[in-house]
Amino acid sequence: MPELPEVETTRRGIAPHLEGQRVSRVIVRDRRLRWPIPEDLDVRLSGQRIVLVERRAKYLLINAEVGTLISHLGMSGNLRLVEVGMPAAKHEHVDIELESGLALRYTDPRRFGAMLWSNDPLNHELLIRLGPEPLTDLFDGERLYQLSRGRSMAVKPFIMDNAVVVGVGNIYATEALFAAGIDPRREAKGISRARYLKLAIEIKRILAAAIERGGTTLRDFIGGDGQPGYFQQELFVYGRGGEHCKVCGTGLREMKLGQRASVWCPRCQS
């Protein structure tokens, strides 16, 4: 699933080609996503100029002069730029054609993504309860410490809770906990303030590094410019269960936590 760095990489790839451009038409080939694409999307968006392309958590917000297109890439979706008129392959559900001659094409083989319309996106039901962005001053270790008090759940699903902080998905939660030396199975309430301060620093560092390297390409992800991400080359533990720790050589362990595969080093993490 594309996580925050992959979505931010997509935003950075498409924004320069969308902002300031006028939409000539919208082609919807299949409306059957996680939520159906609105029947009137073409009417609402065609003829409008795109003002700004933003990201909130893992949602892309394509702001027009009036209204906003909210897009989520789901499990395996992507948005990329193609030339208007390029034949569409299977699973290429939507084209947003621009007067520049480019089109923003939405592909989603598993159809778990979304393309919705809102006149008040930040108060949309999918966004209104989201926690702070991890790369802003609204998120820090003190927030993690305070919210963890009384929480008996494991620390990994705790930091993956979008009400606590957005965008810390399975890949980056796994890597941040390793970097901070914290066992992902530990109860959230049992971790000290000092260790949460360290964890928040590592979350920020790892997410920023992943964005800089274009995200992590494990299966389907490509950025808005059609290029893969390269952060997978720097993964220490994610997807490496049973292999040796790159730091100490101990065998990495793996188990399910909150329905997600979790990998950790029993020596480096406690």
Swiss-Prot record:
Q: Where is the active site?
A: P2, E3, K58, R260
Entry binding sites for DNA: H91, R110, R151
Q: Which PROSITE patterns match?
A: FPG_CAT, ZF_FPG_1, ZF_FPG_2
Q: How is the cofactor bound?
A: Binds 1 zinc ion per subunit.
Q: How does it assemble?
A: Monomer.
Membership in a protein family: Belongs to the FPG family.
Specify the protein name: Formamidopyrimidine-DNA glycosylase
Q: In the record, what lineage is assigned to the organism producing the protein? A: Bacteria, Pseudomonadati, Pseudomonadota, Gammaproteobacteria, Pseudomonadales
